[in-house]
Design a protein with these regions (language model features):
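Sequence-level detector for tyrosine residue identity
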Residues: 9, 34-36, 75, 81, ...
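Amphipathic alpha-helical segments
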Residues: 5, 99, 120-123
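A short beta-sheet element
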Residues: 46-105
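Short loop/beta submotifs within extracellular cysteine-rich repeat domains
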Residues: 19-22, 44-46, 73-74, 109-115
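Specificity-determining recognition surfaces
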Residues: 87-90, 104-123
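Non-catalytic DNA-recognition/assembly elements of restriction-modification systems
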Residues: 1-44
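Short, recurring structural edge motifs at helix starts
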Residues: 1, 22-26, 92, 112-117
Length: 123
């Protein structure tokens, strides 16, 4: 821990928040290579798994999903597809795998603030 540079940072300096390209469940295919993420808080936001749908809508592993109705952040360790009202949180820095739980906790501390914001303003 001596090599870590400790300090205060704005989350906007560490992460970008981006829209996801979404589609409905009727587009899903057989398979379990990808998670289909929705705005739910249940099951880490995973509604179901799917096979390959298309390249355009895939969100990268190593990001977080944010369901805009419950405002819950979940780390995604494999590529994923999104339903409506989901954003992706992309780190601007390299985050070691063993630090993802820490950052998930930090991001979820924003929930009370985000719940008071209109969904259309979360960007």
């Amino acid at each position: 821990m001596n090599s870590v540079e400790w300090g205060e940072y704005k989350l906007g300096d560490l992460f970008d928040i981006k829209n996801t390209l979404s589609f409905n469940t009727d587009m899903l295919t057989d398979g379990n290579e990808y998670d289909y993420i929705t705005r739910t808080s249940l099951n880490q936001g995973i509604l179901q798994t799917t096979g390959f749908v298309n390249d355009e809508n895939i969100n990268n592993a190593g990001t977080w999903s944010l369901g805009l109705l419950q405002m819950d952040f979940f780390y995604r360790n494999k590529p994923w597809y999104a339903g409506q009202f989901v954003r992706k949180i992309i780190p601007k820095i390299e985050i070691p795998q063993n630090a993802t739980l820490y950052f998930t906790t930090v991001l979820n501390k924003l929930k009370p603030i985000l719940l008071s914001v209109l969904v259309r303003n979360v960007d």
